[in-house]
Structure formats: C-alpha cells, structure tokens
C-alpha cells in the first residue's frame, strides 16, 4: 500500500492556493425596494449617473432618472413584471446606446434599436449614445439648400431647407402623417436618408405606413423606429432620441438626413406619466417643469453642420462636405388650440410651422394648409431659383382670397377687380390641392404655377383645374421631356425657359382637351 506523504500534500495545497485567482471585481449593486407601473426604486446604488443603464436580474434593463439621497428612481426599458422587490440591481457604467449606420436603412426597429420586422438581426458596426449634446454655434452653417416635400403648397409658400426644424401641427385626422410620409417618398431622387419615428401609435397604423413606404420604394433609404401605444411609457419617451441618434450618424459624415417625429404630443404625455410616477412636482397641465427642455434638447440636434465640423468628426476622411439633419416634428392639437402648453413650446423651438386645419380638410382642400398662420422662418433662403421666382404671388393671392371671400358673402355687387381677384384666388386654391402619395417634382410644380401666374387658367372652369393639370403634365412629360429635365437638373429660371413654358401652354391649350 502506497504511503501518503503529508509534506507533499501540504505543498500541493500551498501551490493550489498560490495559483488561485479569485478574480474579485468591484460591482456597484443595490436592492429593489419598490416596483410599480414600470418604475423601480433601488436602494444602495451610490455611484449611479443620471441616464445610466441599470441592469436587473433576468437581463432586464432600466434607466436612472431620479437620483435621491438614499435611493435611485429608474424606469424599466422592457417588462417590469419580471422584477420583484429584494432582487439585485447593478450599475453598468454606460449611458444608453443604440446601433447606428447604413445597416439600419430599410429596417423597422424598436426604441432600443432591436429589429422587429422579422428580417433577421441588424449587423450594425457601431453604436452611439441616445442623449447627445447638439452642435455648437461655431459648428453650424446657415440653411441654404432645399428639402423638396413634393407638395405645391409647402414648397411654394412654406419652403423647408436642409437642417431646418419645421413643425407640422393640426387636429387629429387632418393629414399630418400623410404629409410627412409624402415628404419621405419625395426624397427618392435627392439622396436624403430618412428616419420615421412612430410614438404612441396603433400598430395597425404603423404597419400601414411601413407597407406604403415599401410599395413606393421609400423604405430602402428609411429607418422606422417604433414605440407603439402598447409599449411602456419609458420607450415612448426614449424613441425620438434614438431616432435622432440614427439620423445624426449621416449628418456627422457629411450626408443629409430627414427625421419625422410622429408625434411629440404623445412623447410629452409619456414623459408626464413617468414624471408623475417618479413623484416629481407637476406644473401647467400636470406636465413636469422640464417639458420644454424635453423637446428643445431633441430638436436642437437637427441642424446643418459646416465642413470643418464634418472633417474633424471623420478625422479628415470626409473633406469639403456639410452635413444636415432636417426635422419634421408633428404635434396634435385639441380643437385647433395652438396656444396649449406643448404646442406653444414646440412652435417657439422650431423654425416655422405648417398648420393643418380640419375645416379646410373637411371642405375638400387637401393638403389642408392654412396659408395665413403657416410660416417658414429660414426656408426662403433655401428655395430653388425657379420656384422662388414663380411662387412670389401665391401666398398673397390665397390670403387676399380668403379675406375677400369672407367679405363677399355680405356684398351683393362687386367691382370687376374684386371679382377677378376672387376668381384667381379660387383657381389658385384649387391648384394647390394634391392627391396623397403623389409628390411632384420641381419641373411639375414650376409648370403648373407658371400656368396660373400667366393667366392660362383664367378661362378654365374651376371644377376642371385638376383634370387640366393632369393632362398638361402628361403632355409636358411626353412632348417636352427635355425642358422638364432641364428644370429638374438646374432649377434655373430665365427668359428662355419662360418662353418655352409659354409656348408649351399655348400649344397644349390649342391642341388638347382636358
């Protein structure tokens, strides 16, 4: 029988102890003391940062929003029903990040950037912080390039430039989403990448939007970020910031991007819900005191940045190119009340607003743009030459027509000049109507506006304006394709182009029916 050597055994044990790497890691952990309505109170997380990701058991994450003396209030980004009092919570030392890059184009993702379209994983090479500081004054460049929405009424009267924030505001069912989707569809030839953020909407509505983008081929250059009505308030609050980060990826690399927030009223409601559950003091309309900052820090990130900023950001890889992120936030009003708390906030943050009116919508004027109180504060500098030259009198004609039409109801006999003005206004109103999902190119808009300005519509019955426009544009594409291409390519306006447009109108009216 083999004899055991105690010295050998003790040496082996000593060797094992010396070789043992316990791998002690310092972890900042706390204990959940309360869970309710998607809000978690955690005791013991002393080093938590504001906005830091908190990890719970079962791979559930949260975000620290309230840093109190002896506890941390966090919102749960996911299913809070999995959490229980007494479970551990850990600091991650990371601020919330989402995947960014061209890999997200053509995909539908949730507020955290996870794919929800059943097309497999997104192999994004980069992630970026959801909350970022907007570019400073020195890094910016003035807005002087257009974003064509394809709407005659918008591109002529309320032009939008690259890097602008233009609010779309109106009651429910006035065509706000339709206008934003058309603006995305109109970017097919412009090279502008798009992000559509759906906040607090029904899933069926979002599915219809995605289907329409797919049918028109617009999904190829668009990312859809979804935080539907059935998702926690925390995700509805974060979704716009996530979408903005995805859009900024293109802006910072010298490209142009367009982001639609549909709509920020629901984000404000979600943030109000979170704030009240975190026991923050309510203010006007029960919104928290920082609801203005909620939207201002988001919309300030939409900007046009100069070539020096892009060159510095890309470490000299992209030289001599400016980048832009254009925002179209949507706000829903109640009974046309634009002086409510959130609408006035967003109006004061943005560079103009397109006001859609339910009375115009119901009377068949679609898009239902109220030309009187819709403005674009910086877009005028970005308008293309031909549209700027031709569209000068349209806003005036419409505003005067509305005023005179109201006055004419009470007057029995009108002088010829007034009657002429009313007739012209009626035709311009009819001309500004446009079908959904049919954005118009620069040449198409220029052709029909020229016809209106030069009096070619004066003898066309009002009810036939639409069919005249369709037939004339068909004729222009068939017979004057070179002229249309020249206008689209150069966007210039000179005597030669004016003469050719005039000749084409005279020929069309003589030889074609409508």
From Swiss-Prot:
NCBIfam families cross-referenced by the UniProt entry: atpA (TIGR00962), PRK13343.1 (NF009884)
Keywords per UniProt: ATP synthesis, ATP-binding, Cell inner membrane, Cell membrane, CF(1), Hydrogen ion transport, Ion transport, Membrane, Nucleotide-binding, Translocase, Transport
GO molecular function terms noted in the UniProt entry: ADP binding; ATP binding; proton-transporting ATP synthase activity, rotational mechanism
Binding site for ATP: 170-177
Matches recorded under PROSITE patterns: ATPASE_ALPHA_BETA (PS00152)
Subunit annotation: F-type ATPases have 2 components, CF(1) - the catalytic core - and CF(0) - the membrane proton channel. CF(1) has five subunits: alpha(3), beta(3), gamma(1), delta(1), epsilon(1). CF(0) has three main subunits: a(1), b(2) and c(9-12). The alpha and beta chains form an alternating ring which encloses part of the gamma chain. CF(1) is attached to CF(0) by a central stalk formed by the gamma and epsilon chains, while a peripheral stalk is formed by the delta and b chains.
Function: Produces ATP from ADP in the presence of a proton gradient across the membrane. The alpha chain is a regulatory subunit.
Lineage of the species this protein comes from: Bacteria, Pseudomonadati, Pseudomonadota, Gammaproteobacteria, Moraxellales
Family note: Belongs to the ATPase alpha/beta chains family.
Protein's name in the database: ATP synthase subunit alpha
First-listed, main subcellular location of the protein, grouped into a coarse class: membrane
Pfam families in UniProt: ATP-synt_ab (PF00006), ATP-synt_ab_C (PF00306), ATP-synt_ab_N (PF02874)
